[in-house]
Amino acid sequence: MSMKKINFVIVLLLFNFSNLFGQSDLDKFIDNWHLSATKANYETYFGAMDDSFIFLGTAPGERWSKDEFSNFSKPYFDKGKAWDFKASNRHWNYSKNGKTAWFDEDLDTWMLDCRGSGILIKKKGEWKLVYYNLTVLIENEKMKEFLELRDEKK
């Protein structure tokens, strides 16, 4: 094998390992964020968010800034019972400059199967969550029943 090929393989391996290690750190970051809600650790949960954070919840009117979401959530955290989301099947994507990462994940929750998606930015060497969208998953064949339930509430 020529030196050019060897060097190319080494660079390729280093790049892939650095992405894996970065992804592992981000997985830990998001896992810890979910765990802090489970343990009702208010400071850790909201400390992971940038001041510009936006949370989209499952109800039509749920679009909260960090402060709004914090005010809504604080009583749950104060009671020691926030929520318990178990994540799996997480997928990551990254900007070319490495300062933005976005993901989607499957969630096992009290609402059964949900999906979350989020965006993180790196500021001053630290990752912060700027956006999270929580959705309840509904099979297509159950959509008609779901729409009928929504109509009943109007």
Residue positions per predicted region:
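Short, low-complexity, Pro/Ser/Thr/Gly-rich segments in the mature regions of secreted, periplasmic
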Residues: 142-154
